[in-house]
């Protein structure tokens, strides 16, 4: 299963955006272990969030759901840090993953 990635960042050139997308992909794939794991883990994470919300109570998830939830959040944090650095919580930069 493959995935697409699109970064939305104001005031960047196409070359800068492409480089940022590569950093995001590299960090995400490294954190999850392989490119082939991004789409299924993200899809599972999306189902968990749709069922339990953005911040589910720890005891509401099964062990497997908690593992997927935690893995995705860690991978996402690593990708955001690699892409946007210490200012990742400031500004209008956003991303979209398609599966």
Which residues are covered by each model-predicted region?
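A structural detector for beta-sheet-dominated domains
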Residues: 6-8, 53, 98
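Short, solvent-exposed secondary-structure capping/transition elements
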Residues: 16-18, 36-37, 89
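Hydrophobic beta-strand residues in large extracellular and virion-surface proteins
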Residues: 3-7, 24, 28, 50, ...
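Short, intrinsically disordered low-complexity segments
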Residues: 29-78
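Amphipathic alpha-helical binding modules
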Residues: 76-99
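Short, extreme N-terminal segment that most often corresponds to the first beta-strand
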Residues: 1-23
